[in-house]
């Protein structure tokens, strides 16, 4: 169903009962769930709840991704078996998902009999169809532990920016991708020994087969997100270009996973059996509920299948996975929905670096999970844009929207209705024009949710809440209650308020399911569905005593959350200041220290051994620092360092500035951003043109030891041309 189709969906209208299978990416079973993970599970859960409220047959499936070298080594470090480790982690993950209201129909494990059988079946079907190749490859080998090393188990010095302790496939500092053999001074993270090269027989899925390319070109054209389609087309290349490489689907013993049939000592690579785990989890559910599993996965199935994932695993879900399914005789996904990454107060989260806020720490500090569900939903849309958890904004938005605008409507009306009118609404009040407006908006809000435009759904809902509060403030029930002669008007006001509250609760139910349960109990009504928009409260059913549905965020709770994750967040700040690229070139100036996380950390820039000379305030006043908006940005042909920025500085014309930040940013990342520039720097004639100023960037003092480069961004509200003083 396209986005345009979704907007025509009418809440409660007969759409036909759809059969839908939905998955989120499988969390890896060697670590904790953090709030970055929760973006995806909350996004998926809201969509699933939306579809359940339409009455569709929908199943939300998940599992722990349990196989691979990291799990094997983690278990060894803990002195337990891999199976013991994954069983414990499963319980922890299930606890966290339950805490945040993630309503899986089945949360399973990829280390299951169902998954082994399905993985073998798919592999053998691909082999029979000629899609499996066998060849010798050379790999890194740990001579001490006598094991082949995955790329992420080799570290060394980045060949480009020379950052230390970088992984064997990509640099977390400058973003460069490379082969493990490109690392300078590589070492095994398992034993510390220098890896040697050794050959082994491996098995490959022939993604380069012309049949795969032809199928994938057609399949990716149907993806819902244009940016996903464009990225896949980049990887596919032009017709005849043959950019797709065969995919290594095997690993050597020792390895925790499923052994490949007919290949002793060889195991399925985790990325083969992990997506099959979606089907394995669903098969387990089907066996328990008596559902026809084959009817959902066979090639001619009329059911729908959607995968919600992070944009970092698009490659696996839009190339490997659909090709595996197509050529093993199964149905392919209806669509794949990718989301962006989460930052916390502007800093990128990194699980491998331990820089994340755990789900459990959020719960342990007494924060309401539905606050986070609401905040994430307010920022989510149907694109792959990154979202930021700004903790000050989080507190302000929850307190203003959920407490100030929403639950206070019920608290203001319920007392009068119970005390004066036996808890029963006025029947004639259910026809009030304000309620007609709310009922008319419900179908559009439901359509926004289905189109994954959660931010739009919540903005519309809060606009309606503003209208309801305006009505209450105008009617002044607290004044009406002072005079018995106003009883009819008071009854109408309270009745309209509570019916409006019911409708707002309906609009918010996919996001706030536990609050919705409380509302349903308070109003004495059945679980709300979209079809209930036109079924108002009845005088025959008195409301119950009002119980507080939600409290305000206490700043002390935020402080406790930061304290619980202080080491992690300081690591984020340190990583940001130890950053990415070398050499700033003309038009870019290093500043000292850049706030990168919610929790302050010792700045690398503050450790500068060579102190800058002291200047007077008059010296500083000579520098005209201005807010600038980057309206255009492009790479400079012939330069590996420079980007050409077109800046709006609030003047009648734009300015042209060359900045040496190409190693840290792609042009499209900068367009639309605000930054800070030196506006009164003398223009400089360069090889590539005239540079009319300088943008500011932060980096560490010793750029070779701690490379990194970060442009400065002002807070929202700053405008082009404003002076920085």
Curated annotation (Swiss-Prot):
Record flagged with keyword Zinc: yes
Named cofactor requirement(s): Zn(2+)
Sequence positions that bind Zn(2+): 158, 161, 171, 174
Cofactor remark from the record: Binds 1 zinc ion per subunit.
Binding site for ATP: 351
tRNA-binding domain: residues covered: 619-725
UniProt-listed PROSITE patterns: AA_TRNA_LIGASE_I (PS00178), TRBD (PS50886)
Protein keywords: Aminoacyl-tRNA synthetase, ATP-binding, Cytoplasm, Ligase, Metal-binding, Nucleotide-binding, Protein biosynthesis, RNA-binding, tRNA-binding, Zinc
tRNA-binding is among the record's keywords: yes
CDD domains: Anticodon_Ia_Met, MetRS_core, tRNA_bind_EcMetRS_like
Main location: cytoplasm
Localization per Swiss-Prot or TrEMBL: Cytoplasm
UniProt-recorded Gene Ontology molecular function terms: ATP binding; metal ion binding; methionine-tRNA ligase activity; tRNA binding
GO cellular component term of the entry, any: cytosol
Enzyme class: ligase
One Gene Ontology term from the biological process aspect of the record: methionyl-tRNA aminoacylation
EC number: 6.1.1.10
A Pfam family per the record: tRNA-synt_1g
Motif ('KMSKS' region): 348-352
Catalytic activity, as annotated: tRNA(Met) + L-methionine + ATP = L-methionyl-tRNA(Met) + AMP + diphosphate
Short motif ('HIGH' region): ranges: 27-37
Function: Is required not only for elongation of protein synthesis but also for the initiation of all mRNA translation through initiator tRNA(fMet) aminoacylation.
Protein family according to the UniProt entry: Belongs to the class-I aminoacyl-tRNA synthetase family. MetG type 1 subfamily.
Subunit: Homodimer.
Identification of the protein by name: Methionine--tRNA ligase
Lineage: Bacteria, Pseudomonadati, Pseudomonadota, Betaproteobacteria, Burkholderiales
């Amino acid at each position: 169903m396209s986005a345009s189709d979704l907007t025509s969906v009418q809440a409660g209208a007969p759409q036909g009962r759809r059969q839908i299978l939905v998955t989120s990416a499988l969390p890896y079973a060697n670590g904790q769930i953090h709030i970055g993970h929760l973006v995806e599970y909350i996004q998926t859960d809201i969509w699933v709840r939306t579809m359940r409220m339409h009455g569709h047959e929908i199943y939300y499936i998940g599992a722990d991704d349990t196989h691979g070298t990291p799990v094997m080594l983690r278990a060894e470090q803990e002195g337990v078996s891999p199976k013991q480790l994954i069983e414990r982690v499963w319980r922890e993950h299930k606890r966290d998902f339950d805490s945040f209201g993630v309503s899986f129909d089945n949360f399973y494990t990829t280390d299951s009999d169902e998954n082994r059988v399905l993985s073998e079946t798919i592999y053998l079907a691909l082999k029979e169809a000629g899609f499996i190749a066998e060849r010798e490859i050379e790999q890194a080998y740990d001579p001490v532990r006598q094991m082949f090393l995955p790329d992420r188990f080799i570290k060394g010095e980045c060949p480009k920016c020379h950052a230390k302790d970088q992984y064997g496939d990509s640099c977390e500092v400058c973003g460069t991708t490379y082969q493990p053999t490109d690392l300078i001074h590589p070492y095994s993270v398992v034993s510390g020994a220098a890896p040697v090269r050794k050959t082994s027989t491996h098995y490959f899925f022939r993604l380069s087969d012309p049949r795969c390319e032809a199928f994938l070109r057609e399949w990716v054209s149907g993806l819902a997100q244009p940016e996903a389609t464009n990225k896949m087309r980049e990887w596919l290349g032009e017709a005849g270009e043959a950019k797709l490489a065969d995919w290594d689907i095997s690993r050597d013993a020792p390895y925790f996973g499923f052994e490949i049939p007919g290949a002793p000592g060889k195991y399925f690579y985790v990325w083969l059996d992990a997506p099959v785990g979606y089907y394995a989890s669903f098969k387990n559910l089907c066996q328990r509920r008596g559902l026809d599993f084959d009817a959902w996965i066979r090639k001619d199935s009329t059911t729908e299948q959607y995968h919600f994932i992070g944009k970092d695993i698009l490659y696996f879900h839009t190339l490997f996975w659909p090709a595996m399914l197509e050529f093993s005789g199964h149905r392919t996904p209806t669509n794949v929905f990718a989301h962006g990454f989460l930052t916390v107060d502007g800093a990128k989260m990194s699980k491998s670096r331990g820089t994340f806020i755990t789900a459990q720490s959020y719960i342990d500090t007494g924060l309401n999970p539905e606050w986070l569900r609401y905040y994430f939903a307010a920022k989510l849309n149907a694109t792959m844009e990154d979202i930021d958890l700004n903790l000050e904004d989080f507190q302000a938005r929850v307190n203003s929207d959920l407490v100030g605008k929403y639950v206070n409507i019920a608290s203001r009306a319920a007392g009068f209705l119970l005390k004066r009118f036996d808890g029963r609404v006025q029947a004639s009040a259910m026809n009030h024009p304000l309620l007609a407006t709310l009922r008319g908006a419900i179908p559009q809000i439901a359509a926004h949710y289905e189109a994954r435009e959660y931010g739009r759904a919540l903005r519309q809902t809060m606009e309606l809440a503003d209208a309801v509060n305006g009505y209450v403030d105008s009617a002044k029930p607290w004044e009406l209650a002072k005079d018995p002669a106003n009883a009819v008007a008071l009854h109408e006001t309270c009745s309209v308020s509570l019916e409006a509250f019911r409708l707002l609760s309906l609009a918010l139910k996919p996001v706030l399911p536990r609050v919705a349960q409380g509302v349903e109990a308070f109003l004495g009504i059945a679980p709300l569905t979209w079809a209930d928009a036109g079924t108002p409260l009845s005088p025959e059913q008195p409301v119950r005593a009002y119980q507080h549905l939600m409290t305000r965020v206490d700043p002390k709770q935020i402080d406790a959350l930061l304290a619980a994750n202080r080491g992690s967040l300081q690591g984020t700040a340190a990583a940001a200041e130890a950053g990415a690229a070398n050499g700033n070139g003309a038009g870019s100036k290093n500043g000292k220290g850049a706030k990168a996380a919610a929790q302050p950390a010792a700045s690398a820039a503050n450790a500068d051994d060579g102190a800058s000379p002291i200047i007077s305030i008059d010296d500083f006043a000579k520098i005209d620092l201005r807010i600038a908006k980057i309206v255009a940005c492009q790479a400079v042909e012939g330069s590996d360092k420079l980007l050409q920025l077109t800046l709006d500085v609030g003047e009648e014309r734009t300015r042209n500035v060359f900045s040496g930040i190409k190693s840290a940013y792609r042009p499209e990342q900068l367009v639309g951003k605000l930054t800070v520039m030196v506006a009164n720097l003398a223009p400089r004639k360069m090889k590539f043109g005239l540079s009319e100023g300088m943008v500011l960037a932060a980096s560490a003092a010793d750029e070779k030891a701690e490379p990194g480069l970060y442009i400065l961004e002002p807070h929202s509200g700053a405008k082009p041309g404003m002076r920085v003083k």
